[in-house]
Amino acid sequence: MSNKIIHLLLNDFAAVGYGIATLGEHDMLTLQRGTAQPQGTRLVVGAGTGLGVCMLNWQGEGYAVHPSEAGHTDFAPLDATQDALLASLRKPFGRVSYERIVSGPGLLRIFSFLQNEGGGMPSRQLLEAMQKQDEAAAISEFAVNKLDPLAVRALDMFIDGLGL
């Protein structure tokens, strides 16, 4: 019997990709309906402290997982508001990647940008929630429940950044 300890280093989104490959149809939520491709290529995107991305493609007996650093690609604005957001973020960061916008910290940047651009003031309740819990989580919660117009606008812009 060997006393060797085996260590495996794994990209976080590679781990997510391997997990996704084991899910069944009932485990997933469809965002946009299309024609099912049982062994089609899959893309996994997740926003957290950064923007994780991995691709899965069918390799005969299962999916091969390909993690990436796609969150570090340059942000490409789609409208005038996103142009202005990009310009405002170039001041502190220089180069602006998608991860600077589509992540927990990115949601805060969008929220601040909208507020500074005359998008209104957050509600007292949202400000209180932001002091008690993770700020991005509070903004998301208030937006999803339509409790704060500025939070709704920020989350809408965040989702636009994901391309959904």
Regions found by a protein language model. Give the residues of each.
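Phosphate-binding/catalytic loop of phosphoryl-transfer enzymes
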Residues: M1-I101, L108
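Adenine-nucleotide phosphate-binding core of ATP-dependent small-molecule kinases
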Residues: F93-V102, L108-R109, F113-L164
